[in-house]
C-alpha cells in the first residue's frame, strides 16, 4: 500500500477497522498521481453510528461534577475520541488534497496521522472500560466543516491551530492533576 492508498482508506472507509488500521510499511507514491487531488468532500466515510449529527445546537458533554461517574466519564471520552478520529481523517485528507506538498510536510502529516490513530484507539479502550461504545452518542462534524475547505498546506496548519488545538485547550480545565 502506498501513502495515497492509505489516506484513501481512512477518508473513504466506512469502518473503524479501515480508519484505524496501522499501515505497516508504506511504499512511496508514484511520481505520477493516478488521480487529480481531491478538491472537496462534504463528509468522510464513517460507520453509520458515527456519522455526523445533523441540525443546530451543540453536543453536551458531562459537567465536571459528573465525571466521578464511569458512564459520564465514558461519554466525555467518546466526545474526545471523535476529535481524535476527526484529526486522523483530516490528516488523511491533507495527503489527498496536496499530493505535491513538500515531502517533509507530507511525512510529518503521515507521522501525526498515525499518532492520531493510536490516540483514537486509546480513547476507545478506556471508553469500553467505562461501559461506553464508540458510536453510542451523537458526534459532531464541526471541525471537518471548518477545516475541509482548506486550499493549501499553510491554510490547513493555520486552521488546525485555530480550531482543534484551541478547542482542546478549552477542555484542559476538566483535567485535575
Regions found by a protein language model. Give the residues of each.
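Amphipathic alpha-helix face/heptad-repeat signature
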Residues: 80-83, 112, 160-164, 168
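Long, hydrophobic, well-ordered secondary-structure blocks that form the structural core
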Residues: 81-145
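Terminal targeting/low-complexity segments that flank the catalytic cores of oxidoreductases
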Residues: 1-82, 97-101
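Acidic/His metal-coordination segments adjacent to aromatic residues that form catalytic metal sites
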Residues: 57-77, 99-104, 138-164
Amino acid at each position: 500500500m502506498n501513502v495515497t492508498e492509505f489516506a484513501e482508506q481512512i477518508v473513504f472507509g466506512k469502518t473503524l477497522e479501515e480508519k484505524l488500521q496501522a499501515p505497516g510499511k508504506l511504499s512511496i507514491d508514484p511520481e505520477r498521481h493516478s488521480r487529480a487531488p481531491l478538491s472537496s468532500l462534504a463528509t468522510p466515510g464513517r460507520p453509520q453510528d458515527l456519522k455526523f449529527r445533523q441540525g443546530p445546537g451543540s453536543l453536551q458533554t458531562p459537567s465536571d461534577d459528573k465525571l466521578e461517574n464511569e458512564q459520564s466519564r465514558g461519554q466525555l471520552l467518546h466526545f474526545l475520541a471523535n476529535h481524535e478520529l476527526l484529526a486522523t481523517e483530516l490528516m488523511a485528507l491533507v495527503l489527498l488534497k496536496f499530493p505535491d506538498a513538500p515531502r517533509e510536510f507530507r511525512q510529518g502529516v503521515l507521522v501525526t496521522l498515525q499518532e492520531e490513530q493510536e490516540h483514537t484507539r486509546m480513547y476507545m479502550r478506556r471508553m469500553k472500560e467505562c461501559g461506553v461504545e464508540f458510536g453510542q452518542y451523537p458526534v459532531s462534524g464541526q471541525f471537518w466543516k471548518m477545516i475541509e475547505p482548506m486550499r493549501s498546506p499553510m491554510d490547513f496548519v493555520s486552521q488546525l491551530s485555530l480550531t482543534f488545538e484551541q478547542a482542546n485547550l478549552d477542555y484542559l480545565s476538566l483535567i485535575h492533576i
